Amino acid sequence: MSPIPNRDSTWDTVTTVTMLAGAGSQLLMPRIFYSDPEVTVGWKARWHVSVLAPVMTMTALAALNEYSLKGAFQGQRPGCDATNFGLQNCETYGMMSTQSFAGGAALGHGVAVFVVDTLKWSGGRVNGYALAGDVITPFVFGMITAIGRGVGNWETPGEVAVGGLVGLGFGFLSGMAYTLLQRPECGYTGNLICW
């Protein structure tokens, strides 16, 4: 029987917190855009309740992975095999990494929002705050999450990479659909929060 592998519980906590922070950044980040010429010209920031749709989609996909797909893929965690599966630190499978999926999804969503808001809704004008909130913040949290999952011996590099890349793709697609279907402007109400 293979020995029970060591896992770093601190990295498990850190990566869970950074995963939630990355996803939360997309939930709380306003849409920043250069407004239409028909209204007051200049940079605007509007929060949209409709951002719940792509964020909850990514949350549902992460839960599907954690509670269903991992059992179907049966990718063993580092140090686990058929002889010690079910014992301490080998109770669950690692493929694909849910934390890396969520971190990648947050980054993909943020990149899509930034690209569409910059190119379509702002006429190519780049806003530094939008770049920081939509791209840099989820990138930093996603990298800490991905590195921590490997350093803490929770998942293999392949499990982390697959989770992150699949999340990046799904996040980008959902963010693209959201930003193309939902204008950043709240209309003529001037509200900061749009439905």
What is the predicted role of each segment?
Residues 99-107, 149-179:
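Alpha-helical transmembrane segments that form the membrane-embedded catalytic/substrate-binding core
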Residues 1-150:
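Hydrophobic alpha-helical bundle signature of multipass membrane enzymes
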Residues 113-114, 174, 182:
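A short hydrophobic/aromatic micro-motif that marks alpha-helical segments and, especially, helix-coil
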Residues 182-195:
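Primarily interfacial, aromatic-capped hydrophobic alpha-helices that serve as membrane anchors
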